UniProtKB/Swiss-Prot annotation:
Signal peptide: 1-21
Name the record gives this protein: U-scoloptoxin(21)-Sm3a
Family: Belongs to the scoloptoxin-21 family.
Tissues and organs where the protein is expressed, per its UniProt entry: Expressed by the venom gland.
């Protein structure tokens, strides 16, 4: 009888923990927080952070053209090195 009760407790504990993990994942998804191991969500959050960083920076046309020319020069330099 004690063995059956112990097995039942272990089984119920497994179900409760599994449901709690699923609820936490749903909560994170609803809030837009990338969960552990969700590389797709993490990549999307990284891209959003980069976009926000760019939007908050000085994005005047003169500064953008300077930044683009620096990027082009760096790309040319790296391509010529390889």
């Amino acid at each position: 009888m004690k063995i059956i009760a112990l097995l039942l407790m272990v089984f119920l504990d497994f179900i409760i923990v599994n449901x709690a993990e699923q609820n936490e994942k749903k909560r994170r998804d609803n809030l837009g927080i990338p969960g552990a191991g969700d590389t797709e969500d993490a990549n999307q959050a990284y891209k959003i952070a980069q976009d926000l960083q760019y939007k908050n920076s000085d994005s005047s046309p003169g500064k953008r053209s300077i930044m683009l020319s620096k990027l082009k020069n760096n790309a040319k330099r790296q391509f010529s090195e390889n």
